[in-house]
Amino acid sequence: HFQLPPLGYPYEALEPHIDAATMGYHHKNHHAAFIGVLNATAAKWPALTQKPIAEIISNLSAVPEDVRTPVRNAGGGHWNHSFFWESLAPKAGGAPTGKLADAINAAFGSFDAFKEKFNAAGATRFGSGWAWLIVKDGKLEVSSTPNQDNPLMDVAEVKGTPLLGVDVWEHAYYLKYQNRRPEYLAAFWNVVNWNKVSERFEKA
């Protein structure tokens, strides 16, 4: 049985960068809808609840064809959003430190160059999707995925271990930023939880 994970902070905690109305809809409506689809799919295919969702979506080709699409979309959506909420924090932002900062400088030249590349990946993702910072073969890379796909999936164009992701579906920013996606991406850096990202990097 899948459940909507708590955010860990109030909906208004990320103001003014991400507004309370967006956070509320995004969590209670959009994320909750994925949970509903997963529970309905698990009723048809009970194996869905036997393993962590990350493990299942990393091997989509092993999922029965009649449930593969909802598992990919809703399983991806549930994993991506759970990961996204933990990537954000009130009074956060700033810049990473320590080993992660060194790895970012080594891979991209500087923190600003990394942000530019990440923002470009988010801004140029056509339609809906996500931009990611991943570890691939021991190195940091920026990638993007369509829809609710992510770099864990065996179907992803660029596979790796996600460290940070940003949702560029319109529902993630439209109420406040309308079609100004680059403005939302610029604001996102003010609420990135670098402690969490560093913790993921240590484990990757």
Tell where the protein language model's regions lie, with residue ranges.
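Feature for soluble, non-membrane regions of globular proteins
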Residues: 1-204
